[in-house]
Amino acid sequence: MAKKSMKARDVKRANLAEKFFAKRAELKAIVSDVNVSDEDRWNAVLKLQTLPRDSSPSRQRNRCRQTGRPHGFLRKFGLSRIKVREAAMRGEIPGLRKASW
């Protein structure tokens, strides 16, 4: 199990990313636009750097919904590989069964 503080930190990052998404996208569009003057682009870069670091989506980590485990995460289920296996063995995931060939 991940520490509660680590789970809370990821929730905080997700909220910040959602809050600053539009502002960040607007500034990134200015930075990548070649028709904008160099001064305006530089100002956009500086403004982008002043945004909170945790507002960047790349700072988020995929975590298991049940345990908060950051490694072995399967996006399709939102769970870690361990919890997916346990749920599959109990028959809780429809259509998922153990491979046999």
Curated annotation (Swiss-Prot):
Keyword hit for rRNA-binding: yes
One Pfam family, short name: Ribosomal_S14
Alphabetical keyword list: Ribonucleoprotein, Ribosomal protein, RNA-binding, rRNA-binding
Coiled-coil residue windows: none
GO biological process, one term: translation
MF terms (GO), sorted A to Z: rRNA binding; structural constituent of ribosome
An example Gene Ontology CC term for this record: cytoplasm
Subunit structure: Part of the 30S ribosomal subunit. Contacts proteins S3 and S10.
Entry-linked PANTHER family: 30S RIBOSOMAL PROTEIN S14, SMALL RIBOSOMAL SUBUNIT PROTEIN US14M
Family to which this protein belongs: Belongs to the universal ribosomal protein uS14 family.
Record's function text: Binds 16S rRNA, required for the assembly of 30S particles and may also be responsible for determining the conformation of the 16S rRNA at the A site.
The protein, known as: Small ribosomal subunit protein uS14
Annotated organism of origin: Proteus mirabilis (strain HI4320)
